[in-house]
Regions:
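Nucleotide-binding/hydrolysis machinery
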Residues: 74-84, 92-201, 219
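Intrinsically disordered, low-complexity acidic/proline-/asparagine-rich linker or regulatory tail/stalk regions
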Residues: 18, 205-209
């Protein structure tokens, strides 16, 4: 199993990362290197954020999927590969096709079996479980011993919209852990965007109510002026 994040690789290195290169193929190619397709041969290649793949690379990926062969950059020999492809994206690929950012033929080639995973904002019940998992994970990675997240901080995590989904939540928990000086994460340790989001939600209904009240007052005053003029 080999995983690659298509959104994290510079465009200039994308083809080399996927298909490999021969020694001397370009300036920094000091030795031959196998790409992810060769490394995943006989197994599974996970293409994360495939919606970020540039169009030129999409054409070459489609050719590999159809011919089951790759050619390294600077090479002439076609190398057979037998790879199962699993791809993921947070984009609407049908919309990307309409905008000319993703190839329709590649979408059809990949779209054999699809699993739609709802965004994190639509499965709030998962947030406490995921937050606890990330707490354990980063305790180990960062050599920390933070035990829990306070109910108030957890409420703020659950209320947030999470545009970046699970990765966004993990980054927020990790950031809070770095700032935490005791064994509990408090709301003050959370990123500012999460705290400000909560404040905006509290203020918005009040502003809407005040705005409605002001409109009603202005409307009554206008009616009074009209009636006075008619009399």
């Amino acid at each position: 199993f080999v995983a690659i994040n298509c959104g994290a690789i510079p465009l200039t290195l994308m083809e080399s990362e996927l298909f490999g290169h021969e020694k001397g193929a370009f300036t920094d190619a000091k030795e031959t290197q196998a790409g992810t397709f060769e490394r995943a041969n006989g197994g599974t290649l996970f293409l994360d954020e495939i919606g970020e793949l540039p169009l030129d690379a999409q054409v070459k990926l489609l050719r590999v999927l159809e011919e089951r062969k790759i050619t390294r950059i600077g090479g002439k020999k076609a190398i057979p590969v037998n790879v199962r492809i699993v791809a993921a994206t947070n984009r609407n690929l049908e919309e990307e096709v309409r905008l000319g950012k993703f190839r329709l033929d590649l979408l059809y080639r990949l779209n054999v079996f699809t699993i739609q995973l709802p965004p994190l904002r639509e499965r709030k019940e998962d947030i406490p479980l995921l937050a606890a998992f990330f707490l354990r994970k980063h305790n180990s990675l960062l050599n920390l011993s933070i035990e829990s997240i306070t109910p108030e901080a957890m409420d703020q995590l659950c209320a947030y919209d999470w545009p970046g989904n699970v990765r966004d939540l993990e980054n927020a928990v990790q950031s809070a852990m770095i700032l935490c000086v005791d064994r509990q994460i408090h709301s003050g340790h959370l990123p500012a965007r999460i705290k400000s989001y909560q404040m905006e939600r509290l203020i918005a209904p009040q502003e809407a109510e005040e705005d409605t009240s002001l409109r009603d007052t202005n409307s009554l005053a206008e009616k009074a002026r009209i009636l006075s003029a008619l009399q």
